């Protein structure tokens, strides 16, 4: 990736049990600040769930953040997963067809 003047880019392998933000939601919760000492204008580009681990991109490049995160940009993302228990052909077929995840707060 070509670095624009004044922009910083970092990659971090987020461990299981660490929240993908710099401040904890509850006292004692592990967060990025426990692992990284970056400028205050650097933020994760996306997120990984608390109970997942993987590569996390961080930057202060707002154009990059918009390009990756805005749904209308249709950025293709690939995830690898590990499942516990039985994972049959029906479940595999459903995942290959695509799964709609409804988010309600």
Residues of each region from the PLM?
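RNA pseudouridine synthases
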Residues: 1-105
């Amino acid at each position: 990736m070509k670095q624009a003047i004044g922009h910083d880019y970092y990659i971090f392998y987020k461990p299981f049990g660490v929240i993908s933000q710099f401040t904890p939601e509850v006292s004692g919760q592990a967060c990025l600040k426990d692992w990284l000492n970056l400028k205050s204008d650097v933020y994760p580009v996306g997120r990984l769930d608390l109970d997942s681990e993987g590569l996390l991109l961080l930057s202060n490049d707002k154009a990059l953040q918009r390009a990756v995160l805005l749904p209308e940009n249709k950025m293709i993302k690939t995830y690898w997963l590990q499942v516990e228990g039985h994972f049959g052909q029906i479940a595999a077929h459903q995942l290959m067809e695509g799964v709609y995840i409804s988010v309600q707060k």
